[in-house]
Structure formats: C-alpha cells, structure tokens
Amino acid sequence: MKIGILNTDTLKTEFDTKYGQYPAMFSKVLLHAEPKIEIYSYEVQTGEYPVELNECDAYLITGSKVSAYDDLPWIIELKNFIRTLHQHQKKLVGICFGHQLIAEALGGKVERAKEGWNVGIHAATLKKNTILFGSAEQEFNLIYNHQDQVTKIPQESKLLASSRTCPVAMLAIENHILSFQGHIEFDVAYAKDLLQMRRSILGEDKYLKACKTLDAIPQDLKVIDWILNFIKKD
C-alpha cells in the first residue's frame, strides 16, 4: 500500500527538532500500525504534487495553521486537486485542516467556531450506518486543536460522528473519502507543547481544562485501523 502525505504546514524549528514535521509524525503512526506501508510526501505549499494520480493508492491531507477559506494560491490549487481525486474516486483522507479543506472544496462550508478554540482530548460518538467503523453510539477519543470547524457538510457527504465540542467530527463521501477533525498523528507531549504555546490566546481557564483532558487516552490506533481498512476496501 502506498500512501501520499500532502503536507500543508511547516512547524517551528523547536517543534521540528522534538517531533519532526507532519509527514514524519504521520509516517511514525502509520508504520507502527502497518509496517509494510510505503509513504511518500508532497509539499503542496510549494506546488509539489504527484506526477500521476496512481503514484499512490491513497492520499492524506495534513493539518495546517492556515484556514480552509483563505484565498491563497496553493490552497486554491489543493482544492482543485481534491476535486480531481474525487472525480476519479481516488482514496483520500483528511485530518483537521485536511478534513475542513475537503468539505470546502466539495461544496461545504468552514467557519470560525463560535465557541473559539477546541483543544484537548474529546470523545466523538459514531452515528448510525457506520458498520465499517463500529456500532452506533460508540465513542472514540482523539486530540483536537482547532479554531475553525465545518459548519455545512457537502451535499453528497455522510456525517459519521459528532462530539459536544465538534458537531462535524467525521465525514465520508461514498467509498473513497474519509476525514476527521481530530488528530491521529499528535502524541500527548506535542499536544501539551501546543497548549503551552497558545496559553495566553486560550486563556487560563480553557488552558487548564484542556490540560486536564490529556489525562485521558487518545484512541488514535483505533482510528488509524479504520483509515487503513477504509483504504484497503474496494
């Protein structure tokens, strides 16, 4: 299986030194789950894309500090690539910004969350008709770190999970697109460092509450297993 990481951000040097860039984070967790995966990385911020769609079996769009509705040339180009992947029914996974950008590209809407930053570990609940992922009402924990959220889903998409703090936590389109607002690639140490970096922005109350949620166990391995099974499924 070949997975192409469409990288949409560059982390600060201090974070890069401790944790690596996003492609390294995703490679670490994906290879832990499935050591035989081949992983390729494309720096779409600078216009690097696969020469052919079939270079990889699936593509994954990372998180980013920018917004899905920003009018940046590379974001517009990536939205067009998403539409091309969708047209060819190529497997595509979106995480955080990737989740939002897929929704924006295919007719949905992304806006600032009225409640502000959603940070820490939170549980999302699966909806009905999610047999591939688990039974209805089953919960799964992921690390969240976002201030934008999907407020309108694409017409052809299916809402698969919601949480109290994130109404659109998981989406799918037919059998080839799957996306999550939460992070599978973050570990708790990185999440803590992000919270510390944004402490003054979050405010002390939200910061402390978010830190307390990090005592819970994120179920990223379960979600990674869902993603890999989704990619393998015809």
Predicted regions, residues:
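Cysteine-nucleophile active-site neighborhood
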Residues: 62-130
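Amide-donor transfer/coupling interface in amidating biosynthetic enzymes
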Residues: 2-8, 27-29, 41-43, 87, ...
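Short, glycine/charged-enriched secondary-structure capping and boundary segments
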Residues: 18-21, 54-56, 73-76, 107-110, ...
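A structure-centric signal for secondary-structure junctions around beta-strands
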Residues: 56, 118-121, 137-139, 174
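Short glycine-/acidic-enriched loop or helix-start segments at secondary-structure transitions
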Residues: 15-16, 51, 70-71, 103-105, ...
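Flexible, glycine-rich phosphate/dinucleotide-binding loops
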Residues: 12, 48, 68, 101, ...
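N-terminal beta1-alpha1 cap of cysteine-dependent amidohydrolase-like domains
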Residues: 1-80, 84-88, 208-234
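Short, flexible loop segments at the rims of nucleotide/cofactor-binding pockets, characterized by
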Residues: 36-40, 69-71, 119-123, 139, ...
